[in-house]
Regions:
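An N-terminally focused, membrane-permeabilizing/fusogenic/translocator signature enriched
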Residues: 1-88, 94, 212-216
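Positively charged, hydrophobic/aromatic-enriched amphipathic segments
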Residues: 1-48, 110-137, 341-361, 366
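Membrane pore-forming effector domains from diverse proteins
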Residues: 72-84, 88, 94-206
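N-terminal soluble segments of membrane proteins
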Residues: 1-11, 184-222
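Intrinsic-disorder-associated interaction segments
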Residues: 14, 33-37, 170-179, 183, ...
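Tandem repeat scaffolds
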Residues: 228-425
Length: 425
């Protein structure tokens, strides 16, 4: 294997919005025998916070629910077994706030030449807040000369979250108007401010002889902060806001059309608190990570929709059509799903505690590791459903129908029968 000669790695760091996301990537070369670099240990430090951005006559505060750290390697590789950072981590908060550390899940994946770390907060959490002190990310195996490491942190529409809006509209607008306008602002911020990346760090080999120990990135000189003191004018955005506010309709689909939004793809991760979507057809929509607490979703068509990690606590989904929908890791605590059709839906690891599922159709649904504690399942159809690892504590199952289910031991079957469940076949 061709190895570089005596080298000193050089770095460049660019944090575009350091008040909201600040990233450092440090390297420690591991020498082989003499002066050749055989491996490079990577160490990550990352800070998440909220940031104000002036827009027209007002301003918005935003943060991030997650994002992706992508690394591209030149003449190097980092196979999965060389990844160190993975699983749940704690983000330390400012001591002056006296708040508890925030938990964040980090998933590592990708090819050996282009590994990826996906960051995501807990379901229902607003934004990531706090700092991860310098932590070993993994080890790069150097394959030749010249070598290079490029790391970029990017966010998608589902990762950007508004925590406050001031001076752009009245607080008396409807929940539907608010949901559409906030989503328009998120996409505007993403397209005009947050792309192509939030942070970028580049390390590369130096062809000249020098010391072997690398220096940490010079972030002071290369970090660029946005100027949040001056108001920026965006007349087209102001026009959209005005047209949504003055619209003679509160229909969600019509408001989305006025704002130039596609309801099937533009609301992933959106905050849709308390909106009215009763009877609306959003079959096949990408609503992953959406926040729908307290929303009226009765009689909706959400068949085949992606609602992974969605927050639907207290929402009314009575009579909704959710067949084949991906509802894994979704939160339905105290939601009403009475008479809903959830046939063949993926409810793995979903929180259905205290939910009303009376007379719902859950046939052939995947309820692996689902929480059904204190759920109302009386008269529900549960035939062919998979209950591996499901929790049934104090759930109501009178006249609920079971047949050919996976994951139900004889002990559980007896317990459910004693509570009034009906087993057929």
């Amino acid at each position: 294997m061709q190895q570089p000669s005596s080298t000193t790695p050089l770095s460049q760091t660019h944090n575009r919005y350091p008040d909201s996301l600040y990233l450092e990537l440090a390297t420690t070369p591991v020498l082989s025998g003499g002066t050749d670099i055989e491996q490079i240990d990577l160490y990550l430090r990352i800070d998440f916070h909220e940031q104000w951005q002036p827009i027209n006559a007002g301003r918005v505060k935003f943060g991030f629910k997650g994002g992706e750290l992508k690394i591209h390697l030149e003449n190097g590789k980092m196979p999965t077994e060389c990844h160190q950072l993975s699983g749940w981590v704690q983000l330390a908060t400012d001591k002056t706030t006296q708040s508890s550390p925030i938990e964040c899940q980090v998933l590592s994946q990708g090819e050996a030449e282009s590994p990826v770390w996906t960051w995501q907060g807990k379901t229902g959490m607003s934004v990531l807040q706090g700092s991860l002190p310098q932590t070993k990310l993994g080890t790069v195996q150097v394959m030749g000369q010249p070598w290079g490491i490029e790391a970029v942190f990017t966010v998608s529409p589902g990762d950007v979250y508004l925590t406050s809006v001031e001076g752009l509209w009245s607080h008396t607008i409807s929940p539907n108007q608010l949901a559409v306008l906030e989503r328009k602002l998120v996409l505007f911020l993403l397209e005009s401010k947050l792309q192509p990346y939030l942070s970028r760090v580049v390390w590369h080999s130096d062809q000249h002889p020098g010391q072997q120990k690398s220096e940490p990135p010079n972030t002071e000189d290369q970090t660029v902060e946005i100027d949040t003191g001056e108001t920026e004018e965006y007349p087209e955005l102001a026009d959209v806001i005005q047209r949504v506010i003055t619209a003679e309709t509160d229909n969600f689909l019509e408001l989305a059309k006025i704002a130039g939004l596609n309801p099937l793809v533009d609301f992933s991760g959106a905050k849709l608190l308390g909106i009215n979507l009763s009877g609306v057809d959003l079959s096949g929509a990408n609503l992953r990570g959406v926040y729908l607490r307290g929303a009226d979703l009765s009689d909706m068509d959400l068949s085949g929709a992606d609602l992974q990690r969605a927050t639907l606590g207290g929402a009314d989904l009575s009579g909704a059509y959710l067949s084949d929908a991906d509802l894994s890791h979704a939160d339905f605590h105290r939601a009403s799903l009475a008479l809903a059709n959830l046939s063949s839906a993926n409810l793995s690891s979903a929180n259905l505690s205290s939910a009303n599922l009376s007379s719902a159709n859950l046939s052939d649904a995947n309820l692996t590791n689902a929480n059904l504690s204190q759920a109302d399942l009386h008269r529900a159809s549960l035939m062919l459903a998979n209950f591996n690892g499901a929790t049934w504590l104090n759930s109501r199952v009178e006249e609920a129908r079971f047949s050919k289910n996976s994951g139900l031991s004889e002990e559980w079957k007896l317990d459910l029968k004693q509570r009034g469940a009906i087993f057929e076949g």
